[in-house]
């Protein structure tokens, strides 16, 4: 597919998706596309997204409001490797260039859903889940997760890896090590956001 096959409006939608991912690190929802481009209803955005998917410009993943994937990102990851995220500065997207220590070649087809980045683990709070200090956590970028999944959460100015337990607007972030406390989060009050779900781990001994 080349951009020449897109209508001007489809190109505008594709550019908006790319720009949103560059700014925030994740794709927009249908409602966000509507607001950005002045569509009157999410149905209009959905029609353009389905047209872009038919032409191969994007992939639509069912079951999530941000289920828009750019094949060009996957191709870049396959050739360059996945970005390895180290320390994350407050207030900036997790995949901001300043956070990326290096790229590491991974066969992304070994993981499901497809991973988007690697997070360097710090500490032993997830020891009993087999996630150790210095390991690389293989992460699928998403803003939706199920109870029991291991998640990457941004909480205030810190990024943490924990097992998720959610009851409405209240979260419990559970460590897999009895030496670490459970973190209680109230989404109506606390500055918290989901940065992805764990889909695998690369042991520290196998790095470099």
Curated annotation (Swiss-Prot):
Binding region for DNA: 30-50
Listed GO MF terms: DNA binding; serine-type endopeptidase activity
Listed InterPro entries: LexA, LexA-like, LexA/Signal_pep-like_sf, LexA_DNA-bd_dom, LexA_repressor, Peptidase_S24_LexA, Peptidase_S24_S26A/B/C, WH-like_DNA-bd_sf
Active site: 125, 162
Keyword DNA repair: yes
Main EC class the enzyme belongs to: hydrolase
Alphabetical keyword list: Autocatalytic cleavage, DNA damage, DNA repair, DNA replication, DNA-binding, Hydrolase, Repressor, SOS response, Transcription, Transcription regulation
Listed GO biological process terms: DNA repair; DNA replication; negative regulation of DNA-templated transcription; proteolysis; SOS response
Catalyzed reaction equations: Hydrolysis of Ala-|-Gly bond in repressor LexA
Residues of the site described as Cleavage: 90-91
EC number: 3.4.21.88
Assembly, per entry: Homodimer.
NCBIfam families assigned to the protein according to its UniProt record, in alphabetical order: lexA (TIGR00498)
Purpose of the protein: Represses a number of genes involved in the response to DNA damage (SOS response), including recA and lexA. In the presence of single-stranded DNA, RecA interacts with LexA causing an autocatalytic cleavage which disrupts the DNA-binding part of LexA, leading to derepression of the SOS regulon and eventually DNA repair.
Family membership noted in the UniProt record: Belongs to the peptidase S24 family.
Stated name of the protein: LexA repressor
Gene source species: Alkalilimnicola ehrlichii (strain ATCC BAA-1101 / DSM 17681 / MLHE-1)
Gene it is expressed from: lexA
């Amino acid at each position: 597919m080349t951009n020449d096959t897109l209508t001007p409006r489809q190109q505008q939608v594709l550019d908006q998706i790319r720009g949103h991912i560059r700014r925030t690190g994740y794709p927009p929802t249908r409602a966000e596309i509507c607001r950005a481009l002045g569509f009157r209803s999410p149905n209009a955005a959905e029609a353009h997204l389905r047209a872009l998917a038919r032409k191969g410009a994007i992939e639509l993943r069912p079951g999530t409001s941000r289920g828009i994937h750019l094949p060009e990102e996957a191709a870049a990851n396959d050739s360059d490797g996945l970005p390895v995220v180290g320390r994350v500065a407050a207030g900036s997207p997790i995949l901001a260039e300043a956070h990326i220590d290096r790229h590491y070649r991974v066969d992304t087809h070994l993981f499901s859903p497809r991973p988007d980045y690697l997070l360097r683990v710090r500490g032993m709070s997830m020891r009993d889940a087999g996630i150790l200090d210095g390991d690389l956590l293989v992460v699928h970028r998403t803003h939706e997760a199920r109870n029991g999944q291991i998640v990457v959460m941004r909480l205030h100015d810190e990024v943490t890896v924990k097992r998720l337990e959610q009851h409405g607007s209240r979260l419990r972030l559970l460590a897999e090590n009895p030496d670490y406390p459970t973190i209680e989060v109230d989404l109506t009050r606390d500055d918290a956001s989901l940065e992805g779900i764990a889909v695998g781990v690369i042991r520290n001994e196998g790095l470099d």
